[in-house]
């Protein structure tokens, strides 16, 4: 593993991993800011900003942003999560300077045109509608809302139709200047990349990034509350999600929770899959998961079942949770470790995953 890290004088961190056997490079900018960093009135603005970054700069139109990267066979995209936002590209090695230029351009010189903003709001309203029509999206949103009631960490990343429609270009700029600063950003590349050359390109193109926020970034400490939510819909399946507070990703017990989630519902040999599906036939899909955030976590079990099987399903899941607190066999731990290790290593076999 040939990983190099440089912290620029501006505070921006640049990390590369040279993979000389490849012909491509995956690169991107990761910002320690997501939906959790919004104020009450900004619900959904982090995600809207991610969309608007591709809608034109002082140098490029929205179409030019798409065409320039695709003209060389590359691709560019972005994603918003609860605590981070990322803008990334994948190109052949000779086109890295172009990708760096485009990423820097959209992050430092976007115009946030009002007409483009109104069009993109409409796109996001459709995205919100699509999520509301997807039962498993709905159950996870309701679960998060109950787990962290009244807190930004528990809110949907997409926002609501009301908040999305209310945003102006000035509000987007205010969020940007408060959160997109060099001390909160990492520029990363993996593939056939020379570290020193990449650092020089980043230093030149990202020079105009602010080094200090315009105001103190928002992120209140998480308080797990828990609760119950039920929503009746005319569907064939019933979506069920049971859970409790887990561990933050920097805690040692985070990895124990990952192993427990795998033992309970990480594959076809897991306890829940065997008991709930194979032996009792109560559902088609059942799995356990553990999400880690910076100061909290969520451990949960998700299943989809026919409504008539729900009264039997929930007690079985609870019983498996109880059993796991009493006895876990070494063979199960070893199998879970092997599965997690294999997933991690297999998932690192592409430059995009390593970036």
Model segments located where?
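Charge-rich, well-structured scaffold segments of protease-associated domains
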Residues: 7, 18, 62-221, 230, ...
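Short beta-strand-initiation
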Residues: 1, 224-228, 271
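Residue-level marker for the onset of beta-strands and adjacent loop->beta junctions
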Residues: 1-2, 25, 74
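Active/ligand-binding-proximal structured segments within catalytic/core domains
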Residues: 11, 18-69, 143, 180, ...
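Short, Gly/Pro- and small/polar-rich lid/capping loops
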Residues: 1-10
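A generic "binding-loop/recognition-motif" signal
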Residues: 12, 194, 268-269
């Amino acid at each position: 593993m040939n990983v190099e890290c440089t912290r620029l004088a501006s505070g921006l961190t640049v990390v590369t991993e040279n993979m000389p056997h490849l012909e491509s490079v995956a690169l991107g900018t990761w910002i320690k800011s997501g939906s959790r960093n919004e104020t009450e009135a900004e619900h959904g603005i982090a995600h809207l900003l991610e969309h608007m970054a591709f809608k034109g700069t002082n140098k490029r139109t929205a179409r030019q942003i798409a065409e320039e990267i695709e003209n060389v066979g590359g691709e560019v995209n972005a994603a918003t999560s609860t605590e981070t936002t990322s803008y990334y590209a994948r190109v052949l090695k000779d086109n890295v300077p172009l990708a760096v230029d485009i990423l820097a351009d959209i992050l430092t010189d976007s115009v946030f045109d009002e007409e483009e903003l109104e069009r993109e709001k409409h796109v996001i309203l459709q995205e919100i509608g699509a999520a509301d029509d997807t039962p498993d999206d709905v159950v996870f949103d309701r679960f998060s809302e109950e787990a962290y009631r009244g807190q930004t960490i528990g809110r949907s990343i997409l926002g609501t139709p009301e908040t999305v429609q209310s945003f102006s270009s000035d509000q987007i700029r205010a969020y940007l200047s408060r959160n997109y600063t060099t001390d909160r950003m990492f520029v990363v590349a993996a593939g056939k990349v020379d570290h020193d050359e990449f650092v020089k390109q980043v230093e030149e193109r990202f020079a105009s990034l602010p080094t200090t926020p315009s105001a103190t970034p928002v992120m209140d400490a998480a308080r797990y509350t828990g609760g119950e939510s039920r929503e009746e819909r005319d569907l064939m399946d019933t979506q069920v999600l049971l859970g409790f507070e887990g561990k933050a990703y920097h805690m040692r017990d985070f990895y124990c929770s990952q192993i427990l989630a795998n033992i309970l519902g990480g594959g076809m040999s897991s306890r829940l899959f065997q008991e709930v599906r194979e032996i009792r036939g109560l559902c088609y899909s059942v799995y356990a998961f553990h999400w880690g955030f910076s100061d909290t976590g969520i451990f949960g079990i998700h299943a989809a079942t026919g409504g008539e099987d729900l009264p039997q399903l929930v007690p079985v899941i609870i019983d498996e949770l109880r059993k796991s607190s009493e006895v876990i066999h070494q063979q199960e731990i070893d199998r879970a470790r092997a599965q997690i290790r294999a997933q991690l290593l297999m998932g690192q076999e592409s430059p995009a995953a390593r970036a």
